[in-house]
Amino acid sequence: WVVMKQLGFLVMFVAVGTMLSGCVSPGPTQSAVSAEEAEKITEEVTKLDQQWSQTALTKDTAFLKSIWADDLRFTQPDGKVFDKEAALADVEGNTDTVTSSVISDYKVRVYGKNFAVVAGDYHVAGKDKDGRTFSRKFRFTGVWVQRNGKWQVVAEQSEKLE
């Protein structure tokens, strides 16, 4: 009886799973847009990410305010999670003098007209407030969403490589 009961649960589980799998729409794929659209989106997002990397040198918070969505969730390598306001405060309070800010091994995946995921490596170098030189490398993944014709970052996570 116990074996039959377990078998019955297994059959029911498989049947329900099969039924539900037909109810779930597949996730967006790169085929959701034409190759031309994907290329245009890739160029736009890449340009914005490159500009973002340069704000380490310029501390252009006006630019960051424009590309960081109000609902931004930014997870730092140490596990701290910042919203937009906290991330801006972190930039404004940073006393490092950055001399180099470079993105490499950068890839964009377009999943629709309004959605892209980016990943890459980021290397920043300079001097801290005490004049000591630093060189930091990170790997990041970011989520860009287009709202009202404007691309913005809604999530970003990075981990320190060195």
Predicted regions, residues:
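Generic short beta-strand segments
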Residues: 120-127
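A short, structured loop/turn motif at beta-sheet edges
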Residues: 108-116, 132, 144-150
